[in-house]
Design a protein with these regions (language model features):
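N-terminal non-catalytic structural scaffold regions of very large proteins
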Residues: 1-228
Length: 228
């Protein structure tokens, strides 16, 4: 298995190594120190945890039709790669199969289908399984969180969504082919919840043995990347 990596060597300042592990989690090393999740580094840069997903992924809205108990989502020709369709494309406008499973397709054909009127697709429940929720889904009245952003959609998830009569769910644009779930997966294993926690974690790596202080931690981090 190929493990990808990159190294940023500035004219001045700290070296930054970025690398995948065998589970496709993305880590980074500052000045070749102990590795940390890349999402920890992003949070230390001031990006909030709930902003990281939207920074790297688009969002699709899946709408549940109570009429036929199927899901409707916009058809994006750009998401189509050259090859055979794994699932039939069903036109949500009339419920008819626009292109059968196993048919060879490419971006040009997909664009023509879109121009000819294929704007939305109709999907079965199983076509959502394995995808990821893009935003927290909450009870507007009580504030109860039903599902958290980045949660993987399972058959149990779909069953609960229907029980709660939730008609729309935001889903991350991750297909495992054009766009991988690497950042999402890394965020799931990252225990830091805020920029403050992240910068303290990095300070512990850079200055092991020294008691962490938030103000000092920010000063050290900023001196590595933002001060000449």
């Amino acid at each position: 298995k190929l493990l990808f990596g990159a190294r940023v060597i500035p004219y001045r300042g700290s070296w930054l190594d970025i690398e995948f592990d065998h589970k496709d989690i993305i880590h980074c090393r500052i000045d070749r120190k102990k590795k940390i999740p890349i999402t920890t580094f992003l949070m230390a840069m001031g990006i909030k945890r709930d902003e990281i997903l939207s920074l790297f992924y688009g969002t699709e809205t899946y709408s549940l039709s109570t009429k036929d108990d199927k899901w409707k989502v916009g058809f994006n020709p750009k998401n189509i790669k050259t090859g055979k369709l794994q699932k039939s494309l069903v036109n949500a406008a009339n419920g008819k199969v626009a292109v059968k499973q196993g048919t060879k397709i490419n971006p040009a054909i997909a664009k023509k289908l879109f121009n000819d009127g294929l704007k939305n697709l109709l999907l079965e429940d199983d076509e959502l399984i394995g995808k990821f929720i893009a935003e927290d889904i909450i009870n507007e009245k009580t504030g109860e969180i039903y599902f958290e952003s980045s949660d993987e959609i399972t058959s149990e998830t779909i069953e609960k969504i229907k029980e709660l009569k939730i008609s729309k769910i935001p889903v991350l644009e991750i297909d495992g082919i054009n766009i991988g779930s690497f950042i999402r997966d890394t965020l799931r294993v990252d225990k830091n919840l805020s920029p403050e926690e992240a910068v303290v974690e990095i300070y512990k790596v850079l200055r092991p043995g020294e008691p962490p202080n938030l103000e000092t931690a920010f000063e050290v981090f900023n001196s590595l990347f933002f001060k000449s």
